[in-house]
Amino acid sequence: MTQHTQTPSMPSPLWQYWRGLSGWNFYFLVKFGLLWAGYLNFHPLLNLVFMAFLLMPIPKYRLHRLRHWIAIPVGFALFWHDTWLPGPQSIMSQGTQVAEFSSGYLLDLIARFINWQMIGAIFVLLVAWLFLSQWIRVTVFVVAIMVWLNVLTLTGPVFTLWPAGQPTDTVTTTGGNAAATVATAGDKPVIGDMPAQTAPPTTANLNAWLNTFYAAEEKRKTTFPAQLPPDAQPFDLLVINICSLSWSDVEAAGLMSHPLWSHFDILFKHFNSGTSYSGPAAIRLLRASCGQPSHTRLYQPANNECYLFDNLAKLGFTQHLMMDHNGEFGGFLKEVRENGGMQSELMNQSGLPTALLSFDGSPVYDDLAVLNRWLTGEEREANSRSATFFNLLPLHDGNHFPGVSKTADYKIRAQKLFDELDAFFTELEKSGRKVMVVVVPEHGGALKGDRMQISGLRDIPSPSITNVPAGVKFFGMKAPHEGAPIDINQPSSYLAISELVVRAVDGKLFTEDSVNWNKLTSNLPQTAPVSENANAVVIQYQGKPYVRLNGGDWVPYPQ
C-alpha cells in the first residue's frame, strides 16, 4: 500500500493581492482635472494617504470589498475638503439662516451649482478612462501623478498647482498721498499705516504679517474733539449702508457710467469692507473710529472711543436708525445694537410701500419713500445736529418682486436704487439743508462667481466682493465742489470714513467761501486689504491675494 504525504499549501505572496485602484482611478483623475483648472484647494498628503489605503493588499476578498464601502464616505468627505465649498463649521453656523430661505431661492441656489461645461468635461474623461483602461494600467499613471504632486510640496516653501501666468486684478498697496508714517507692532515695521510686505509669502510669514497687521490696527484711532467750537455749524450726517454692492457688481451690471457716481464729491476706488456678511460689516462701520479688528474681536466689547455714532452723540448729534427691512434675518438688528452700539429706536416703517420681498419672504420697503420720510422728519428739527444710520437691502441675492418667485434681475434692482439715490441727492440739493451723506456698502453681492465660489456665494471674502464703492457727498455748502469726484485711490477702509467725519464735524466747511478739498481728502488713513469671516481670511500680499480656510495653510487665491 502506497502512502501519500500531503504537504501543507504555502500562502500566496502578499504582492499577488495588489488589485489596483479600479474605479477609484476615475475619482483621482477628476480631481487632477479640477486641480489643473484651479477649482480645488488640493491636499496632496491626505490624498496620498487615502490612495495608499485603497492600494494596500488585502488577501480576503470580502475585506477588500468592505474597504471599498468604507472608502466611499471617506472619499466624499475628502473631495469636499479639497473643494472651496463651505466647511461643516460654516454650514452649521449658517444652517438656521439657510432654513429661513424661501423654497424658490433654495432651488435657484442649487441650479447655480450645476456647471454643464464641467459635467460635459467629466463625461468625456469618463469615456476616455473606460476606453484606455482596456490596454493601459491607469493606476500606474495615477499613482505617479499623486507622488509627483506630493514631491512638489517638498521642493520649496511656496508653490502653486494651478497653471502659470494667471492674471490678478488686485491693488498694489502703495502709499500715494497717504502720510509717510512709520510705526512698529512688536519688532515688525509698519510703513505708511501698513505692515511691510518684504518676506516671501510662506504660511509662517503670512501668519506673522497678519498678526502684525492686527497689532498695528489696535493702536489706530481717530480722535474726536472734546467739544465743538462756538462757531460750529449744525448739519445732518446720513450714513447709507447698502447690502450687496461692490465695484465688481457695478461693472457686471453695466452701471459704471450711471449719473449717481458723478454726483459724489469723494469716491473711494479701493475701499475694503473687511467682510462679506452683513452683520460684521455693519459692526465694522459702526466701530469705524478705531483700527480694523479681527472677526472674533467684533463680538467682544470695544473701547468707547471706537463707536462712531457714540462719538458724535457726545458732540450733540442725535442718533437715528433706519432700515428698509425688519432686521430680523440672522439677528441683524440685534447685532447692530449689541455689538455696534446703536441703541436708537428703529424709524417707524408703517405705511411704507413694499418694493420687494426678501429671500426669506419679508418685505423690503421702497428706499426713496424711506429717505423722503427721513428728510421730512429732519426738516422738523431745523438747526439741530443728527447722525442717521440707514441700512438697505434691495440688492441682496434672492430678493424678488411681489407675486413672482424668481429672483429679480440684479441690474433692474441696481438701476432703480441708483436712480432713487440720484433723485434723493437732487432733492437734497434743492432743499438747501446742510447734510453730509456717506455711502458705504456692506459687501458685494458676488454677481460674478469665480473658481472658488458660485455667483451669490460669499463664504470667502474675495477681493471682488470686499472692494466696494464708498463715497461722500456734501449738500447745502456755500462753496460746493465742482467737477468730477475726487478719487481716493489708496487702499482704505472704515477708519478713513471716521477721519473724514472728524474733519467735517464742526460743520464750518458748509459756510466757508472756499473749501480746501485737498486738505480735506489728503493723508487719509490707509488700511491694508484684509478681509475675514468666521472661517476664511483673505489678504493681499505683495500685490496678490492669498486665502486661509479654517486656520489652515495659506494658498494663492485662484484667479
From Swiss-Prot:
Keywords: Cell membrane, Cellulose biosynthesis, Membrane, Transmembrane, Transmembrane helix
Topology in membrane: Multi-pass membrane protein
Pfam families documented for this protein: CBP_BcsG
GO cellular component entries: plasma membrane
Any one Gene Ontology BP term: cellulose biosynthetic process
Source domain of life: Bacteria
Segments passing through the bilayer: 34-54, 68-88, 113-133, 139-159
Places the protein is found: Cell membrane
Family matches, as NCBIfam families: cellulose_yhjU
Function: Required for cellulose biosynthesis.
Name the record gives this protein: Cellulose biosynthesis protein BcsG
Organism field: Salmonella typhimurium (strain LT2 / SGSC1412 / ATCC 700720)
